[in-house]
Amino acid sequence: MDIRKIKKLIELVEESGISELEISEGEESVRISRAAPAASFPVMQQAYAAPMMQQPAQSNAAAPATVPSMEAPAAAEISGHIVRSPMVGTFYRTPSPDAKAFIEVGQKVNVGDTLCIVEAMKMMNQIEADKSGTVKAILVESGQPVEFDEPLVVIE
């Protein structure tokens, strides 16, 4: 399924009153949900994070101390224009394992410059800058899975 077609479907869901849309073409399928159901996922993840922190606290006191300290700077760090993932997939900073990264922190980018790649269903989708500016932060590590609408890059 073409990325342009997926973007059109996302716009259709945003503009209409429907809460979820699922389309299948052959072996490929896409499910798009409105923001209300997606917002419930982080709440559930936070609910699961608390018990996970309590269990290591009994066996190892250092582990819970590092988790909150990593979350606090990330929340404070996100200011400026945020480029978000248009799909669920795997984030890559480089076009190939040996190649130089598309962007680095501090680099100036223009509208249309490739920032990264999100691989979805064996298709490499280039994520382009929708604003000119300077890369302030890259929020995801290369090879890490990303969710729909997850912040990837901050441009100032």
UniProtKB/Swiss-Prot annotation:
The keyword Amino-acid biosynthesis does not apply. Pathway: Lipid metabolism; fatty acid biosynthesis. One of its GO terms (biological process) is malonyl-CoA biosynthetic process. One of its GO terms (cellular component) is cytosol. Keywords: Biotin, Fatty acid biosynthesis, Fatty acid metabolism, Lipid biosynthesis, Lipid metabolism. It holds the Pfam family Biotin_lipoyl. The keyword Membrane does not apply. The modification N6-biotinyllysine is found at K122. InterPro entries: AcCoA_biotinCC (IPR001249), Biotin_BS (IPR001882), Biotin_Carboxyl_Carrier/Decarb (IPR050709), Biotin_lipoyl (IPR000089), Single_hybrid_motif (IPR011053). Residues 73-156 form the Biotinyl-binding domain. GO terms for molecular function: acetyl-CoA carboxylase activity; molecular adaptor activity. SUPFAM superfamilies: Single hybrid motif (SSF51230). This protein is a component of the acetyl coenzyme A carboxylase complex; first, biotin carboxylase catalyzes the carboxylation of the carrier protein and then the transcarboxylase transfers the carboxyl group to form malonyl-CoA. Homodimer. This is Biotin carboxyl carrier protein of acetyl-CoA carboxylase. It comes from Escherichia coli (strain K12). The gene is accB.
